[in-house]
Structure formats: C-alpha cells, structure tokens
Amino acid sequence: MNTVVREVGRRERKFFGKVPEKTEIYEDLVKIQKDSFRDFLDKKIMESIKRYMPIKIPVKASGKKNKEFLIDFVDVKFEDSSFSENECRDKGLTYAGKAYLKVRITDSATGEMIEKDDIFLCNIPYMTERGIFIVNGAERVIVNQLVRSPGVYFIKEEETDTSKEMFIAHFLPIKGAWLEILYNPNPGKEVLQVRIDRKRKFNFFLFLRALGYENDLDILRLFPKEIDLDDEVELSNYNNCTVLSDLSFQELDDMDPPRKSTYGMKLYEVLELLKKYEIKSVTVAHLVAEITLEKMKKRYEKEERLTSLEAYKEIFSKLKPTEIPRAQKAKEEIEDMYFNPEKFDFSQIGRQKIQVKLRKAYIDYLREVEKKDISEDMEDKIKYPIKTFAVDKLDIILSARYLLHVKENIEGLDTRDHLGNKRVRSVGELMQIEFERAFSKMIQHAPEKLAGVQSINKISPQSLINSRSIMTAFHQFFASSQLSQFLDQVNPLAELTHKRRLSAIGPGGLKREHAKFEVRDVHHSHYGRMCPIETPEGANIGLITSMAILAKVDEYGFLKTPYYRVKHAKVDLNNIVYLSADEEELYRIAPASAEIGEDGSLVEEYIEARYLGKVSLFHKDEIEYISVTPKQIASVSAALIPFLEHDDANRALMGSNMQRQAVPLLRPQAPFVGTGVEWLAARDSGYLIMAKHKGIVDYVDGRKIVITRLDEENNVLKDSNDEPLKDEYTLLKYVRSNQDMCINQVPIVNVGDVVTKGQAIADGPSMDMGELALGRNIFIGFLPWEGYNFEDAIVVSQELLENDAFTSIHIEVFETKAMDTQLGPEEITADIPNVKKELLRNLDEEGIVKIGSYVSSGDILVGKVTPRGESDTTPEEKLIKSVFGDKGRDIKDSSLTVPHGIEGRVIDVQIFDRKDIPSLEIGVNKYVKVFIATKKTLQVGDKLAGRHGNKGVISTILNKEDMPFLPDGTPLQMLLSPLGVPSRMNIGQVLELHLGWLSMLTNDYYATPIFDGATESEIMDELSKVREEHELYLGDDPDQPNGKIVLRDGRTGEPFDFPVAVGSMYMLKLSHIAKDKIHARSTGPYSLIHQQPLGGKAHFGGQRFGEMEVWALEAHGAAHTLNEMLTYKSDDIKGRNEVYKAILKGENLPEPGIPESFKVLTKELQGLMLDIKLYDEDGNELDVDRL
C-alpha cells in the first residue's frame, strides 16, 4: 500500500494518491470577498466619483462675461468603525466606518484655487476579517453574481412564431439599450434587420442610411462576395447583383449610357464581356445585401432616396409612435442611445472582448473593402482601432459582415453558457453600482444648490453632499437585495461555501422561471472554475453553484484555474499559470492524472488532452499545460467526500449539500477516512486560531492562550523595555450563530509547547486538532434488523448516547423591550401581579432571570408589566390608593416567558438602554436579551447522513447488549440497510467502510484525495493482513478478500446466516432535529375572522383537516366524527365553549351550532351586493349575527 505520511492540522495522516501536490497552490478561500471589498475602498469609489468630476457651477457676474466655479473631489479617506464587531452584534448595530472627501474648488476666471478636507460623504458598511458584514446586528454575506459579460455575441436563435433559425449579432452593454443585428438565413427570407432596444425590427440598411451611408454603392461595397464565373449555380444566384470589381473595357463606352468601368453595373449586363476577356472571377455585392437594399428601397424610397436625417425620422416614428417625429430630435435621441459613452457603456471588459472577437473580421474588411494588401506576417501587428466604450459604426458593419459568414462557419457562433462569456460580479462591484447610482443622482442637483454663489469662499461643498441618499442606497442593498443573504452559519463549511457561492439570479441576472435547461447544465468550460456537483436540488438547480477549490477571479471578473506549464514534455512545477475559460481553449492541456517521472517529464508517449473544447490523443511533446491536481474540478464541499469518483453524481450532490447541514457536535471527531482537504476548510473558516508568530506557550485556559515569541534559534524575543514579547489570543466561548448553533473555541496546545507560525493552537466549532470535523466515526454494519432499517431508517446503539457521540448544544436568544405606551411606560420588575411564587424563583430583584438558571417552557425570563387604561376612579378607590399606595393600580402582565417546547440553561443576559445604544428605536427605554443553551442528545426521528448522500432517520435506539457483535465481542454502533447502496449507486460508502475499519484496527488516519485515492485492491489486501493479526478473519475469503465478517445476534448469541460488511463510517447529525419539529396543540389561538385554529408550530397551531381529509371521512361514513371536526374542533364558537363545560361536568355533548365560516360566507356574499336571508324549517327569518 503506497502511502505518504504528512502532517495536517496537528495530526499525521497517511496519504494515498500519486499526483505530487504543493500546499502553496491553496490560496485563502475567502480571498474573492476580501480582495473585492478592498478594491472597492481603494479604487472603485474614486473611479465612480471621477466620472462626474468636475462639477461646473455657472456664476452670473455683473458687467463681465459669465464665469464658472469647478468643484473637484480629489480624494477619499476612511475612518475606522466607532463600535467593535462584537458590540455591533450584541447591540443590533451595523459595522460601518465614515468616508470623507477632499475637495478642490477652482475659479475658472482667475485660476484661484482652494482645498478643503474632511467633507463627510457617508457611512460605509465594512467587511470583517471573515469576509462578512454585520448589518443591524446580523451577520450577512454578499453572494457573487455570475452575469453575461458585456461585448458582442453571435448566436443562433429560433424565431418564436415560425421556429425557424435566426442568426443574431447581439451588442450587450453594462449600461444602455440593446442593439441586435438579425440575419434570417432561410431561403426566400434572407434579409438583414436591426432591432433597437428590444422593440421594433427595421431594415438594416435603413439604419445604415441613418448612420450616413446615403449612397447605395457605399452600402453594397461593405458586403463584397467573390464569385467564380465558371460556377453555374453561383452565376444564376448572383446574376442580378451589383458588380464591385473596377474593370475597364473598350466596349463599355458604346453602352447606353456609356460607362467608365464595371463598378456599379449589374452582373447580367457585363457577363458576356467578362467571359469574352476570360475573366475567371469577379467581386459582386453579397446576395443578402442586394435583397436587403431592394426591400428597403421598395418600402421607404418609392419616390426619392432617403437622407440620413429622414432615415432617423423614419426609425424614430416606429420606436415612439405617440410622439411627433422631428428629424433632428430623432437623430439626437438615437445617437445618444448608442454613441454616447454616458448612456451606452461596454466598459473596458466589453470593449476588450469586442476587439478580440472582431479583429479577424477587421483584417478581412481591410483586405476586401479598403483593398489593403496585408500579408499573413502583418496580421499579428494589426490592432482593432476602436477604443470608445460606446458603439462605433465599424462595430456595426463588421458584426453584420461576420453574420453573413456564420452560415458557412457555424463554429464562429458563441455559446451563451461558455464561462468565457460570463463574469463574476463580487461584493466590491455590486457596492460600486449602488454607490454610483446614488452619487450620480446627488450630483445632478449640485448646480441648483449652489446657484447664486458669487465668491469662491462662500461655496460650501458639504451642502452638495446628501449623505443620507447614499446611506439609504447601501442600507437597501444590504437589507433587501437578492444577493445580500443571511449568513448560513450551521457549521464552518456552510459559512465558507456561502462566501464562495455563485448565483446567476439577482438584479441584472436570470429569472428562475425563465432559465432553460442549457443555462443550468454542466459545461466543459466549468472545469476547475465552477463545481459541477454542488448545487441545490430545487428550482435553483444549476443557477446557484459554487466556485471550484482552486478557482480565482481576475481583475475583469473572469474565473481562472491554475495549470503547470509543460515545455518539451517536461512539467515545470514552479511555473503555475492561471488560465481563463477563453484562454484555455487555445492550448493542449493534459489531466493531472498523467504520469510524471521523477525528473518532471511526462512518462506516457501519447496522452489524452483537452484542446478546443474536445478531448483527443496527443503526443507528449505537443502538451502545453497540465492540471495542478485532480481535485481542482470540485468545490470544497465536494472535495471533502472520499471516493467521490465511485459515487453517482446525484448522490454526490446530496452529500456535498448535507455536509453543510451538519450540526457542530459537543465531541466532534476528524474522519478516519478523509480526503486531505479538511485542514484547508478549517484554516479558511475563520474559526481556527493559528499562531501569528513562532513561540512557546506560556499560559492556557478556556478563554485565552498566551504565547511568548521565539526567534529561529528558540531564544525569547524581547521588546524595547527588555520584556518578553507576548501574543495573547482570546477564545470565543458559547457564542450564538445565525442558526442558533453554538460557536465555541477550545485550546489544543499545552503550556510549554513550541508552536510555529501558522500552526493551529485552538479548534473552533466542528473541528478536531486543526481539521474540519463535522461528525463522528461510527462502527457500522450493513444488515437488515427486524425491519427497523426499512426504507433508509437507521438503528443506533444506546452506546452513542452514553458517549455523547451526537450530542449538540444549541443557543437560542429571547428578547423583550420596555416601551413607552400612551398610558405610561412599561416596567421591568419582579413584582408581577397574580403570578405564582415558583415562577419567579429564577428572577433577580430587578425581574431579570439569573445566569445559570435552568428554565423550561412557561418560566418567566424577564418580568414586565404594562399599564392598562384606567377608568375614572370612584371616591372609594381613591381612598384605597391613598391608604395602600399604588398597589391597586391597573397593570397587566406582559413578561417574557420561555416558549413551548424549549428548556435549557441561561448562559447570558444582556441589558441595554439608550446610553448603550443611542440609535435605539423611539419609545424603547430598555432592551433585554436572554440566551438559553439547550443540550440535544440523539433521539428517534433525528436525521443522520454519511458523506455520500446516504441519509436516513433514526427508527429505534437499541441497548448496547442487543446490537450484533464481532467474534471478539465488539458490538456495532449503527445498522444500515444494505438495500440503500445498489440502486443509489454510491459505492464510495462501501470503500469508506473498509478503509475505515482498517483505520480503526491500525489507529491510523488516512487521506484518499478525490480522483486520486486508494484502490479497492490496496484497501482489501491491507485489511486482510490486519484482520488476520487481530484474529478477525472469520467470514473472509483469503483468495478473494471481501471485507465481510461473521456477526452474532446480541439477543441470542447465534451467528447470522451470512457474513456482513462492517467498518467505520463517518456520520453527521443534520440540522433537522425531531425535537424541534414535533408539536401537538391542546388549546391555542384562533384566527380573528374565521375563528379557526391557527396553523404551524410557531403559532402553537393545529393540524389542517383539509378538503381531501373530509372526503376520506365521508367515504367511511363517519358522520359524527366529521361533524365534530367541522364544528367544535374548528370554528363553532358557542359549541366549543359548551363542550368544554360539558366535559368538566361530565355531561353529554351538546348539539353543534353553526360554524363561523358559514357566517363569514354570508357576509362575503353581502359584500358582493347580494341580499342573503336565512329561514328556519318553519319559514321564520333568522338573524345571522345571533346564531
């Protein structure tokens, strides 16, 4: 068995795998968030401000010519937040800092200039070290959005009405109206059209007329086509086309009228002449161009040729039929729409992509239209000349030319779903969009605000800045944008994945309802950039994905993945190159599994490699790059599944999603069978404490670790006062997460330990010795047990409960506010009227629960009384009040109590008033938060899962002595049904089982990296040897080891009929805990109008007895039961009160009355102006309200 021992976290693991791997390739997994936000502060804010600078303030000067003041915002600086992260969490504040502008004001007439600092701009929410934001006390994350990159796209679409194909050149800006050029290639309909702003379609040449091509020949010469005069088919097609070759013949002078050359004549007019002089080929106008021109003239130029202005007017009248078309206005509006960089913006990325896309078309244009002689050597030197971020005429003409050639060259079409055509908008860019939107609105009103200012010294720049509008924009973005999400904090992996999520939905993205299958599907360009496995199972499948483990985003937002450079069949392990999806297509790339010799050269002569989006066989000398590691295809979650290569994709998807739902356990264990990525997930989660410098541990307790720094020779480093330099690390203790989980850090070093820089010194939640530990290693057997593990149910041993194997701590927060009411302030007090003494036992003298108290449902946490409306007091009451004080005042109990179904220990109480939180809501005097920690042990109904999508619910908990046991007496801890494996095709769990058993027997931890892990034969051969050493060989076949063993029934001691597969499997407890879901209603609230019980656990509601359930009782003829269901138990108000009395007195139940829903129905019909009257059996009219 070939394994290499490596230290990961603070333990050693035996690594399988043949691919050499460097730790340096694993960058910070949250880098995308941190870098993007840093870029926003460092560059993007100023970038947005500069776009609107300088602001010009016109000044009317008496007697002189008018002058203007120029206001320029030169620089921006930021202040730290006035509250710490923890304060913001506790007090419900936003973690934000102030931004200030430096302003320069210039008098354009005199050149006088003044500068002012510290002009307050706004409060900007800051990102924490963990890559998240704290907004109103809640931790939130901004999800990265995957959007189509701006540029020009050539795509094939089916027409909605005819389902015929159509080729489209689509100009997609970051800001502005769409422009589409359409080419219908279907015979008889071959014509070029243009669609403006997704509205009307026009003849493309009408648009060119508007752009200034007023001469027919000027338009046709843009679309030349060389034809062979010997080709009869081509001749018949192009017979009526205009000749663009400039040929002179003597005979042309004799024509009527005389011609100087063939240029501009029809082909049929000069065909004989060309054949006479044996000319083999001639350039004519493209057939589609001829047809398009003909149709345009037929429709718009019946009498005379249109001018540019008239063409604009014609287009405008169709775009806005309600407005009066004026030629000049039409020209200005349409030109403004596409040729003004302020209204239409491709951005630098878009322009760059257009330059790459149309460069070849531009070279062809120079050769064919401009008649330039360009050799192949010169091609590389020719650059696309257009630099503007708006549309240019050349872009339009080249795109139309490109479209005409697409029919023959179908590879020239773009794939919408290729990652080269998509870019990532991270938090920085999304915040910039919000900032710019608010800032531009604010600047528009600047000249009005400063109108009438005569002196430069009287200009107040602060009056220009409306910081509230910018702060509102940020607040709305963080509070309500689809991309600002409540952080998924179930465990560190869930949090890490949330920060690396890619979403195709959101503003400017796709809509879930309209997203077709193709958009959601896996594409070859996702390799190493986007995980093909991790995505939700519901309506968002394929739209919400995760970044691959090594993917990073470049400055333009394109996803890149790393490769090693290969030259002359030699891999350069020191040369890592990041390639985007577009760049990757141009190279021959070998997979990471290609065998590399000790000297770094490729071993095999021929290697399967990717090139131009396909996989082919290449000689090793042709290989240009090689993948860095086999795991670069997957996300962090998927890379944590051992033997992923043996699992069906659907189950792997479930496995990676369920790991994110694993509850942090009280006693977590790192997996015996890992993949070697556990340390990475722990490192970048933000909860693992690592040593900042080399040092020796000086002091350790549950709340802090002190380390004295050492130099390379292990000598103590000292400061300027000759005191030892010490680092103090504070640990988080029992902090509540967004999902009510417990965040707790535990030291893993002892006093005297020497630690190196970056070494783990304290575990966070779901961690064990510096590695991610989401669950427990459980000794499992695959055998049916009395039907208790039917349909994925799980049988567990009492031993797991005794060991607290799946016990977890959950922290819930309950809060109350003491408000000012119209009748006086509410009061927090222990003096609560009409309450039993025992309910007050846990309260202190102020009426707030004591820390450490054990409370259960109904117990008072905070005593609070609210004043009631007092009627006019009688003289007697006044006398009582004057004698006994205010004891008889009219107050009601509004205390905070523990909700139904919750019990636990109070671990913290926080009390705030207006001094602590100046921004407390108006009318709130005191704000109290009580934290209760609940210990949840394993129970029937809890959901457990492995890492391979193998999930199930606990059906029974057996005594340890009743569990099946091994020949050496070891009992199993869990029994799974063997029928859960074959049809699910997740065989990875069986291999994990065998390797896990080997790990248990040898006390070694293993790592089997995905796509490069242990083979079945390696595991079986070693397991067979070790079993023999431990005398556990019963049931195994030495010639063909199968990993099975003879088990005995714990109840009878008899052996089972067949050997059973046993071993250690890593199991997780998911956050679907039976105790949180189980619920029964006794007496509870009713809805106001229908008077029926509310629904749902939160409202202490009942179970809905719906239409189909009524049918079921009808079918059984259970008339009385049905009657009760629809009256007493539902909405017969009078009836249910009578029943209560009858039950108390032991009498027979009364007859049911009329349900409230009947009365509601009559009221609704009356609301529809229908006169409803009710009569009894004797014909007497009844009053509905009195029934």
UniProtKB/Swiss-Prot annotation:
Cited HAMAP family: RNApol_bact_RpoB
InterPro entries attached here?
DNA-dir_RNA_pol_bsu_ext_1_sf (IPR042107), DNA-dir_RNA_pol_bsu_external_1 (IPR019462), DNA-dir_RNA_pol_su2 (IPR015712), DNA-dir_RNAP_su2_dom (IPR007120), DNA-dir_RNAP_su2_hyb_sf (IPR037033), RNA_pol_bsu_bac (IPR010243), RNA_pol_bsu_CS (IPR007121), RNA_pol_bsu_protrusion (IPR007644)
Entry GO MF terms: DNA binding; DNA-directed RNA polymerase activity; ribonucleoside binding
Which is an annotated Pfam family here?
RNA_pol_Rpb2_1
Its biological purpose: DNA-dependent RNA polymerase catalyzes the transcription of DNA into RNA using the four ribonucleoside triphosphates as substrates.
Q: Which residues span the membrane?
A: none
Reaction catalysed by this enzyme? RNA(n) + a ribonucleoside 5'-triphosphate = RNA(n+1) + diphosphate
Q: Which CDD domains match?
A: RNA_pol_B_RPB2
The organism's lineage?
Bacteria, Thermotogati, Thermotogota, Thermotogae, Petrotogales
How is this protein organized at the quaternary level? Answer: The RNAP catalytic core consists of 2 alpha, 1 beta, 1 beta' and 1 omega subunit. When a sigma factor is associated with the core the holoenzyme is formed, which can initiate transcription.
Please give the GO cellular component terms listed in this UniProt entry. DNA-directed RNA polymerase complex
Q: What is this protein called?
A: DNA-directed RNA polymerase subunit beta
Keyword check for Nucleotidyltransferase: yes
GO biological process terms held by the UniProt record: DNA-templated transcription
Q: What is its EC number?
A: 2.7.7.6
Which keywords does UniProt give here? Answer: DNA-directed RNA polymerase, Nucleotidyltransferase, Transcription, Transferase
Family from the record = Belongs to the RNA polymerase beta chain family.
Q: Its encoding gene is what?
A: rpoB
